[in-house]
């Protein structure tokens, strides 16, 4: 008996289990992660633009008549594009993740209802209807929060520090090393 347990694959939990449940919508989940990563990259564009605007001002200080207004304007517009890109990419990341989450919830609820139909009637008599309702409503619904919200945020939180290090290395390698 102990030998049988060693040969069985270990049950997946956490992130791996949620991704396994959403495997029918794998394309949407990965697209959501990709768009969340792009949103994280765009979120740094305004800060980078501010850095270059300040740098431009400091190069000409104290003679502000030498200030290149078109360069500052370009960096300002780029900051605006970065903000809009962040909003748009994050919106579509959440849209994709919500479609995947609701599709997964539908499949889980249908599978649960099908499973309940095949259980002997005597089993249903020993359980309260509230227990089955709790499984259907609360437990299955908890998967939605992870797939729809936490997964895109998780990807963005992994990408953001990498982007920050790349930006710091690009500005001055000593910042990136520190």
Where would I find each of the regions flagged by the language model?
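Juxtamembrane helix-loop junctions of ABC transporter transmembrane domains
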Residues: 11, 34, 43-50, 82-133, ...
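Short helix-capping/hinge motifs at transmembrane helix termini and TM-loop junctions
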Residues: 59, 101, 120, 164-172
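Transmembrane helices of ABC transporter permease
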Residues: 24, 28-39, 152-178
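A short amphipathic helical element positioned immediately N-terminal to and/or at the very start
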Residues: 11-29, 131-132, 136
